Structure formats: C-alpha cells, structure tokens
Amino acid sequence: MATKGIVKGIVSNLVTVEVDGPVSQNEICYISVGGVKLMAEVIKVIGKNAFVQVFESTRGMRVGDEAEFEGHMLEVTLGPGMLSRNYDGLQNDLDKMEGVFLRRGEYTFPLDNDKLWDFKPLAKVGDKVAAGGWLGEVDENFQPHKIMVPFTFKGEYTVKSLKEAGQYTIGEVIAVLTDETGKDVE
C-alpha cells in the first residue's frame, strides 16, 4: 500500500508533508492541488515529516492537501529514440508540447511508442545473460543502441525466446528470459 500524507507547510516550492508510513530520500510523490497532481521529490525525512521539493509552481497549494508517495525514486526511461528528442529535466518530450510550457501537472512519455525500429538480435536462444547483457540492437542516428537485460534483474537468466531480425515498436516483447528458479520474465 502506498504511503500517504497531508501537506503541513509550504514555502515556495519546498513543502512539508506529514506521512502515515515509510518514505525514503529521493522518493517521488504527487501532491493533489485542485484535482491536478504535482510531482515532487523527497529531499529530507525527519520523523513523520517528509520535506519535498515540487518541480513546478505550488500556486493554489494549501495546508491539508493530500500527497501520495510512489515508493520509487525519480527515474528516466531508456530506449531507442532518446538521441533524437529534446527533454526537460523530468524527461518530458519538449517536441510534444503545445506552446512554450507544459500545462501544470502534465507529463509526457519520453519515447515514441509507434515508431518501428530495425532490431538485430545479438544473443540467441539458450544463451546465459545477466543485468546489462546485450540481447540485440537497433540503429539510432547511425549509432547502435543496445537492447539490454534490465539492470534491476538479479542473477543469471537463460534466453528462452528472442525476436528475429525485423521491425518492432518499443512496446513489443523482444525476449523472454528464464531465471534460476524457472520463472519466465519478459
């Protein structure tokens, strides 16, 4: 269950939130302000108080507004297409923006879900792989972009299936790996 909290103090974009459970430094939370969720990052925790930095204007925020903590740190999405896009500090795709600014509480997905990429397998069925191991590659701006085993994967995996060379979107499953306990993961 996600940790929740209530805004207890606001000084510009620094907000104090009283929490009902565990939170960690650098964890992401969203504070609801008039139906809009504003992203923030925990910068300090003292007892039941989390001190968070909101990434946009806190105009309209009030003591008593609700916050929900995500249980994970600020992350970026890695994948083909990153080298040909323009991002802000939260990896919002600036080319998708209408006008000069994103609307408050609005975030964009950083990669193109519809683009087809020419995939070339580098591993083969039966290979043993681990976090960071190369499964294949796609070319982006004449540079090979490696498709890797996610860095969050622990231990050794066996490649159960792997797509053949061809065109695929970033949302398609490229490989199925089997972990040391026999569990399959995509």
For each feature predicted by the language model, list its residue ranges.
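Acidic-enriched and Gly/Ser
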Residues: 2-3, 18-186
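Extreme N-terminal "head/tail" segments of very large remodeling/mechanoenzyme assemblies
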Residues: 2, 8-11
